[in-house]
Amino acid sequence: MISANRPIINLDLDLLRTFVAVADLNTFAAAAAAVCRTQSAVSQQMQRLEQLVGKELFARHGRNKLLTEHGIQLLGYARKILRFNDEACSSLMFSNLQGVLTIGASDESADTILPFLLNRVSSVYPKLALDVRVKRNAYMAEMLESQEVDLMVTTHRPSAFKALNLRTSPTHWYCAAEYVLQKGEPIPLVLLDDPSPFRDMVLATLNKADIPWRLAYVASTLPAVRAAVKAGLGVTARPVEMMSPDLRVLSGVDGLPPLPDTEYLLCYDPSSNNELAQVIYQAMESYHNPWQYSPISAPEGDDSLLIERDIE
């Protein structure tokens, strides 16, 4: 039975922030740079955190640090605590921020990463009005450059703007669930018409692998591409978010090469002197995105953080 008089531990936010930095960056050295402390100070902080919670958070095996079961458990709570702390501070600081923020979104991001972004912005800046404009990926950069939009969410990295990676997703080949790809025949492709970064990527990937292809269906909108693939007209390549029960993923077994990952990017034009866009961009830049993938292993000999797993 748990005693009602059991003392409550108040977790130190600085210790939690360093703990999360170590988990995210994999080494004490990298975490030390991120939190502006020395490596020895980070080590001392982690010892203090272990003493505070009364549990071992790291299991030491040589130079490697393994995150224990308790460490993994604390990591989830630490992320939530820091998120709500930072959100509360931002909300109080910018609760009176008003105006209209125009966000341009490519069709790939409209029903994937965009809802996450809108939720984050509206929860921290409740008085801010949001105007969303969805267009083809190829036209987003022009809209940001001409200041038709304040920020843009795109899957094509522009060279002229600052870009923040909101999420990286695998890219797959798709066909209808019952579709049979004929071996020895050119790959029947269902693609957007030009200009389209995805179209360019698909054709470049197939050409590099010396795989013959043909255009089976060319569409002007992403919904039309989805409809054509579901109808069994051919094969397309899109991020993992396109997956649905009436589609199936093709792979190397089907004779198709791997595709580069898709980046969902939040872009901002520093030359626009748009203070509102700058505030939102910087806020997102400092917000930890739990969707991001980060490696959990490191080269041999490095003092990396590894997640301890049960071995059969």
From Swiss-Prot:
<dbReference type="GO" id="GO:0003700">
    <property type="term" value="F:DNA-binding transcription factor activity"/>
</dbReference>
<dbReference type="GO" id="GO:0003677">
    <property type="term" value="F:DNA binding"/>
</dbReference>
<comment type="similarity">
    <text>Belongs to the LysR transcriptional regulatory family.</text>
</comment>
<keyword id="KW-0238">DNA-binding</keyword>
<dbReference type="Pfam" id="PF03466">
    <property type="entry name" value="LysR_substrate"/>
</dbReference>
<dbReference type="InterPro" id="IPR036390">
    <property type="entry name" value="WH_DNA-bd_sf"/>
</dbReference>
<comment type="function">
    <text>Not known, does not seem to act on the proton translocating NADH dehydrogenase genes (nuoA-N) which are part of the lrhA operon.</text>
</comment>
<feature type="DNA-binding region" description="H-T-H motif">
    <location>
        <begin position="28"/>
        <end position="47"/>
    </location>
</feature>
<dbReference type="InterPro" id="IPR000847">
    <property type="entry name" value="Tscrpt_reg_HTH_LysR"/>
</dbReference>
<dbReference type="InterPro" id="IPR036388">
    <property type="entry name" value="WH-like_DNA-bd_sf"/>
</dbReference>
<dbReference type="InterPro" id="IPR050176">
    <property type="entry name" value="LTTR"/>
</dbReference>
<feature type="domain" description="HTH lysR-type">
    <location>
        <begin position="11"/>
        <end position="68"/>
    </location>
</feature>
<dbReference type="InterPro" id="IPR005119">
    <property type="entry name" value="LysR_subst-bd"/>
</dbReference>
<keyword id="KW-0804">Transcription</keyword>
<protein>
    <recommendedName>
        <fullName>Probable HTH-type transcriptional regulator LrhA</fullName>
    </recommendedName>
</protein>
<keyword id="KW-0805">Transcription regulation</keyword>
<dbReference type="Pfam" id="PF00126">
    <property type="entry name" value="HTH_1"/>
</dbReference>
